[in-house]
A protein has these predicted regions:
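N-terminal helix-turn-helix DNA-binding core of bacterial DNA-binding proteins
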Residues: 6-50
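Amphipathic alpha-helical recognition patches that constitute DNA-binding helices
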Residues: 12, 16, 77, 81, ...
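Amphipathic alpha-helical dimerization/coiled-coil segments
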Residues: 87-114
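Accessory beta->alpha helical hairpin/"wing" motif in late/C-terminal subdomains of nucleic-acid enzymes
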Residues: 82-86
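Short beta-strand/turn micro-motifs at beta-sheet edges
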Residues: 3-6, 68-69
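A positively charged, amphipathic N-terminal helix/segment that binds anionic biomolecules
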Residues: 1-3, 80
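Beta-hairpin "wing" of winged helix-turn-helix
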Residues: 59-75, 81
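Basic amphipathic alpha-helical segments that dock to polyanions
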Residues: 51-58
């Protein structure tokens, strides 16, 4: 059964966050969520209960750093940035995802197999 609209596939949240920060540079949590929603054409929505624990976990692993700043609407916000270690992890996770997507594509195209 496919995940309900808006849910991130299990195991892809770190990849999505790392890639978003790699593409756009420092962003606050709301900015990350908005960008993911925009790029996915509203298919994926990162809620606070999912996103902020992930950001904390990524920071604890040394893949991102955070720093307080002021948002466009003059509010205090924590901005997250990708680290060198985070870029390496992004490359690893991207390669793993591409391998798995290839396997799934082959399985879906294997009509009559089995």
């Amino acid at each position: 059964m496919p995940p309900p609209r808006g849910e991130v596939l299990q195991g892809t949240l770190d990849l999505i966050v790392l890639k978003t920060l790699d593409a756009l540079g420092p962003l606050h949590g709301y900015g990350i969520a908005q960008r993911v929603q925009q790029v996915s054409e509203d298919l994926l929505k990162l809620n606070q209960g999912t996103l902020y624990p992930a950001l904390l976990r990524l920071e604890q692993r040394g893949w991102i750093t955070s720093k307080w700043g002021v948002s466009d609407n003059n509010r205090k916000a924590k901005y997250y940035s990708l680290t060198r270690s985070g870029r390496k992890q992004l490359a690893t996770e991207t390669a793993t995802w591409e391998r798995m997507a290839g396997v799934i594509a082959r399985l879906l195209g294997a009509e009559g197999a089995g």
